[in-house]
Design a protein with these regions (language model features):
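N-terminal Rossmann-like FAD-binding beta1-loop-alpha1 element of flavoenzymes
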Residues: 30-55
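Short, well-ordered alpha-helix to beta-strand connector turns
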Residues: 28, 50, 231, 249-251, ...
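Active-site/ligand-binding neighborhood in enzyme catalytic cores
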Residues: 113-117, 123-252, 256, 261-263
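C-terminal catalytic lobe of FAD-dependent flavoproteins
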Residues: 344-401
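Glycine-rich FAD pyrophosphate-binding loop
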Residues: 47-71
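Mid-domain catalytic core of redox enzymes
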Residues: 12, 49, 239-364
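Extreme N-terminal leader/targeting segments of oxidoreductases
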Residues: 4-30, 48-49
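Dinucleotide-binding Rossmann-like beta1-alpha1 core, especially the glycine-rich loop
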Residues: 72-147
């Protein structure tokens, strides 16, 4: 009976051409949908415990959004900049078993018109804005602006931001960037989006407070490749386009795509913000002098420019393998984009409306013994990379007891 014949990988495409349907192509313990960090970690840990795993990904490469591609000796972050940071030594040690990390420190620069400011807001920023030198002078300046605004009960994001840092910082470094990111004017955005704005009264441009920080030497893709070594992976394989084959191929599914899409948008669409990237290779050795430059003017359509070589070269700028000099550079302009079905969802919109909608899908998922949802889309929450690892290892511990 060909419908129930067990066949080996590689035969499926042939049978598909002959229009022969197979109930069981191969039997797996877990089908993992998505080869990003969450899916790859689960696959790696399950494989170590002797579980039979199949990983599928709709993209032609592994790695999800942390995928990096080496172009002319430069590791390009294809889906936006990713800087690993954590204060959890266990998580730092875990990720370091797959790659050696450099000592990159995230110190973005904000550009407003032709003025450049250090981020996050610190004494270097305040000195450039007002000429103040001491922390006390900076505090007085910010408090004066907050008092002048007189906002006691912020009604929108604009009022909330001004009540936290004053008008000058808000107008130059917050307003335009935030409006581009959300696709709405700040006066139309709810105040709860900005609960706090970090202000540091020290001369320190390190964006993160975490103890451990860096970029893997050689890029992120190698990490995922090592995790998936020896595991069957099918690329350019969209779960939804191959659902008939895949839905009964394994005992359980680890699903890292959008939870609402998995359930056919039963309760309606969750909202996201998307991104669009424009990448250029330039015939200059050093374009902007920093890995990340944020553009805070609303009139500039992109939110930031990434110069990828600066993530890894640091003091030895321009040096690639063998000590040769990279005479070119690669930059990426990042444009916030409205999300519609068919576009890549990057940022979850965790407002009251969407949180309420997600809770309905979560309730459905909790009753579903066939599937486990993971990652930012499966759990509808923005995660830094260290938090993804924590969630994935938690899932492994609970599932593979």
């Amino acid at each position: 009976n060909t419908n129930k014949k067990l066949i080996m990988k590689g035969d499926y495409d042939y049978l598909k051409l002959l229009n022969i349907s197979c109930v069981r192509i191969m039997k797996y313990d877990y089908l993992i949908v998505g080869s990003g960090l969450f899916g790859a970690i689960f696959a790696y840990e399950a494989n170590k415990k002797g579980k039979k795993v199949l990983v599928v990904d709709k993209r032609p490469n592994v790695g999800g959004n942390i995928y990096t591609e080496n172009i002319d000796g430069i590791n390009v972050h294809k889906y936006g900049a990713h800087i690993f940071h954590t204060s959890n030594k266990e998580i730092w040690d875990y990720i370091n078993q797959f790659a050696e990390f450099n000592r990159y420190t995230n110190a973005p620069v904000a550009r407003y018109k032709n003025e450049l400011y250090n981020m996050p807001f610190n004494m270097n920023t305040f000195n450039k804005l007002w000429g103040v030198v001491t922390p006390e002078e900076a505090k007085q300046k910010i408090e004066k602006e907050k008092n002048e605004a007189g906002i006691k009960e912020p009604k929108n994001l604009e009022e909330q931001a001004i009540s936290l840092v004053g008008k000058t910082i808000y107008e130059k470094l917050v307003k335009g960037y935030t409006e581009k990111q959300w696709g709405k004017r700040a006066t139309e955005l709810p105040s709860f989006i900005i609960k706090r704005l970090p202000v540091r009264f020290i001369y320190d441009n390190n964006y993160f407070n975490d103890i451990y920080q860096g970029i893997p030497i050689g890029g992120y893709t190698q990490i995922i490749e090592k995790m998936l070594d020896g595991i069957e992976v099918r690329l350019s394989c969209d779960y939804f386009e191959n659902k008939e084959e895949l839905e009964n191929i394994a005992e359980k599914i680890i699903f890292t795509g959008p939870i609402d899409k998995y359930y056919g948008y039963k309760f309606g669409e969750l909202e996201y913000r998307s991104l669009r990237f424009e990448t250029e290779e330039l015939d200059v050795e050093n374009y902007q002098g920093n890995a990340v430059v944020n553009y805070t003017e609303y009139e500039v359509p992109y939110t930031r420019i990434i110069e990828h070589k600066h993530f890894e070269y640091g003091p030895s700028l321009g040096k690639i393998a063998g000590g040769k000099t990279a005479q070119k550079t690669i930059i990426t302009k990042e444009y916030p984009d409205k999300w519609i079905q068919g576009k890549e969802p990057y940022y979850t919109m965790n407002d009251e409306k969407n949180t309420s909608l997600y809770s309905k899908y979560k309730e459905l998922a909790d009753k579903d013994s066939k599937v486990i949802f993971g990652g930012r889309l499966g759990q509808y929450k923005y995660f830094d990379m260290d938090k993804v690892i924590i969630e994935a290892l938690k899932c492994v511990k609970e599932e593979l007891k």
